[in-house]
Amino acid sequence: MDPAPSLAAELWRPHHHRHHFEASSVVTDQGSGSRGGGGSGRRRPRSDAGPEDDDLSKVVSTSAASGGGGGGGQDSDAPEAKRLKPMKSSDKNDSLRTEAGTDSGNSSKAADKNATPPEPPKQDYIHVRARRGQATDSHSLAERARREKISERMKILQDLVPGCNKVIGKASVLDEIINYIQSLQHQVEFLSMKLEAVNSHMINGIVAFPSKDFGAQPYNTAAGLTFDPQTTREFAQGSTSEWLHMQIGNAYERVT
């Protein structure tokens, strides 16, 4: 207990009660002194007391001196001892916590080091080690074969179309091929129209002439309209009109 409240209580007590309290305190002091003296003769002071015990004894002595050696000294020693015990226990708990934290940190680091890295996902295709610019899987190999076939077909078309070898680029080559095919289509249509006109004129001329003028030479339209293998060369060199006049002239010469 704190000595200050006990002193205040003594000041407010009546005079006769105060004398009685002083007498009782003297008796208790004498008894405690006699006990202490007897005990001092029997017990030896501990030489192996630590610094904490020395501090505790100092606190107890100072509290006893401030209390005036009264009966409240024994009561004031108990709270101080109780205060020091929780302080010691809290220090021990803190040290245990720090040790546990360091142990857990070391164990977590060791677990991270011992943990094996995750395996990479397996690929559906077999990876082939190839040079730079070469395909490494089946899909790219098939695409490469398809592109090679397309390039071969383009080369064949370039050889067929005159002047297409000078063009660079697949798009421009295809444009040249399309234009050439369209021009051939127009030429074929024009030639078919001319042939129809020639056939109509020839049929009208045959009907106008009498049959006795021809004699024994029958007119064969198939022979008159036969095409020589040199006609394609002549068409490439000259115009279509010249070729038609040439064919018509040959047909009339054979008829006559």
Curated annotation (Swiss-Prot):
A single BP term in Gene Ontology: regulation of DNA-templated transcription
Keyword Transcription on entry: yes
Record keywords, A-Z: DNA-binding, Nucleus, Transcription, Transcription regulation
Domain bHLH, residue spans: 134-184
SUPFAM superfamilies hit by this protein: HLH, helix-loop-helix DNA-binding domain
Annotated spans, Basic motif: 134-147
Annotated stretches, region: Disordered: 1-125
Helix-loop-helix motif, as annotated region: 148-184
One cellular-component annotation, GO: nucleus
Subunit structure: Interacts with RSS3. Forms a ternary complex with RSS3 and TIFY11A/JAZ9 in the nucleus.
Family designation: Belongs to the bHLH protein family.
Identification of the protein by name: Transcription factor BHLH094
Species assigned in the record: Oryza sativa subsp. japonica
Gene that encodes the chain: BHLH094
